[in-house]
Every structure is written in structure tokens, then in C-alpha cells.
Amino acid sequence: MQLLPLLAAVAAQATTSQAVQAAPVPIIDMHFHAMGADALGPPGSKICAPYGPWPRRDPAKAIDEYVKRFTIAPDCARPLTGPPTDKALLRANVENIRRYNLIAVASGPSHHVEALYRTAPSQVIPALSFGDGPLPSIIELRQLHAKGLLKVLGELTFQYAGIAPDDPRIEPYYALAEELDLPVAIHIGPGPPGISYFGGPGYRMRHSDPLALEEMLMRHPKLRIYVMHAGWPMGDAMIALMYAHPQVYVDTGVIDYAFPRAEFHAYLKRLVDAGFGDRIMFGSDQMVWPDAVAAALEGIESAEFLTAAQKRDILYNNAARFLRLGKDGKAETQ
């Protein structure tokens, strides 16, 4: 009679072991968004994965014609479509987190971030995106941090407001991040092409120079910071900054799926060949198109110049080190 419980226990253990073996290895997505389905226009907008060639604009025609070809009805082999409702987008985000065993640094409006965090608390690192709209007060940020709802400061989107990364208006946020040991995620580089004409009139590409961070880094030597989009297309400046400031990391958000694959791989290889493969972190920049996660992962996995170990570093190890995560995926110091 005692044999039956023993067999049941062995069977349960075997099933658990098989489940663990079948589970995908964890991936850290340093550039994930939690937002409403209409955050980037009417629900159901599209993005190409990848574009190629980029849509061109005839300035004699209304900007709506360009926007249609860019994100409403783009002509590409693989258009990704956004879900119709906030609930559908949240559900798809949670499904992706579970399917790919993601630890997602999720930024966006605080209520959307909190909704995602409450749904998958063990796999979501809550962050706050701001910079091109009303700015949160330092008191508000301290309160979010005290509640455990602010563990990364960013995505800082000041570039969309025409504000350079070394602008004095950002200084209080850098100082707070250093004080609280909050990693900073800053947007430097590409927005949607042509965004200055239809969605972000303040955006200027000239504010994409990573070296603009240099004096700030000297004022805040203990600050953890990563440059989103790997500073594309400013490869020389990005390499120079990482060389001179060994604490600076980058993520691969959006350039790993929306950009022509040859361009992304050439840019990624440039950073790796320059000796910075251990400071490159995977980021999907999933906004309102959940399938962007799969497309972004393909961008890394298809890079034949990377070894399996280098891919694993980009997909997990580098970010785990930067975030100071323990073996269980939880923060060691926060």
C-alpha cells in the first residue's frame, strides 16, 4: 500500500523535471513597453519587421499619405499589427512573457505598467517612461520607488521634445537615479522616420550623439545607464563613449526587428568587433505590436557572426549583470 504514494511522488517529480527541461531559458528584454492600444495612433496600426526600403515622402503631398505608407498600410513582407483593445494588448504581452520566459523591463504610463506588473510580478521589472510630455516630480518618483513600482528610470524620451541628453532639465532625474541606484534607460537615436512631421515635432536627430552624456557621467560616476537603440546610427560616438566610460551599456531595441537585417547585423557586429559584446543587451522595443518580440529575437538568433555564448550574453547574461540579478532572477540589491 505504501508503494502507490511513492510511485505517485516519483511520477510527479518526473513530470516536474520534464516541465523544467521543456521551459525555455530565460531572456531579459531591456526595452519592453506597457501602454494602451491607441498609444501610437488608432488601434490596429502596423509596423514592418523589417522595413526595406524605408518609405519615402513626397513633400508636395499631405503628410497623411506618408503616414499611411509607413504605419497604416505599409508595403512590406512582414507587417505586424497591433491588437484592437488595451485588454487584448495586455493579454498578448503576458502571453509573450510566458512563451519566451521573459524578464521584461516594462516602461510606459504608470497605470499600464502596474497592470502588467500585477499580472506577472515575477517577470516584470517596472519602469516609468517620460520626457516628451508632462514630467513627474521627484516626490512622485520616490513614492513609486517606495512602493516597488519603479526599478528602472526610463525610457527617458526627452529627445522627442527636442531636449538633448545633457540638458539641465534632466539633471534632477539623473541625480535621483544615482542616489537610489536606479538604472537609467535613455532614448538616444532613432524615432519613427519622419516623426518630426507627424507625431513629434520636437524630435531632432542631432540629439542622437551618445557623447552628449559624457559630462553628466562625470558628475554621476555611480550611475548605471544604458543607451537604448545602441545609439544608432552614431556607431563611432557610441563606441567612443563605451570605451571612455566602461559602465555604459546599450540595448538593441527596434533596430533588431524594424531595421533592414543587413544594417542591424552590420551595426551589431561593429560593436562586438570593437570589444563591447559583454555590454550589449537585448531589447525588443515592443510597443503596441506583440509580435515584435519574436521578430527581435530572430534578429539576434540569425546573426551568424555571433557564437552561442555571445548570443546568450546579449539575451541574458549582460542584462543580469547590469541589473544585478541573482540566480533566481530577482534583484540582489534594490
Name the predicted role of every residue range.
Residues 1-9:
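Sec-dependent signal peptide recognition
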Residues 45, 49-86, 92-109, 124-129, ...:
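Divalent metal-dependent hydrolysis catalytic cores, especially in the metallo-beta-lactamase
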Residues 88-93, 133-144:
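Short, acidic/polar
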Residues 31, 97, 153, 177, ...:
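Conserved, mostly hydrophobic/aromatic
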Residues 87-101, 105-119, 162-186:
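Aromatic-lined substrate-binding rim segments of carbohydrate-active enzymes
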Residues 25-75, 91-95, 276-281, 287-334:
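Mid-to-C-terminal alpha-helical segments outside catalytic/metal-binding sites
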Residues 118, 122-124, 151-152, 166-281, ...:
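Catalytic pocket-lining loop regions of alpha/beta-barrel enzymes
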Residues 35-37, 111-114, 133-136, 159-161, ...:
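Active-site environment of divalent metal-dependent phosphoester hydrolases
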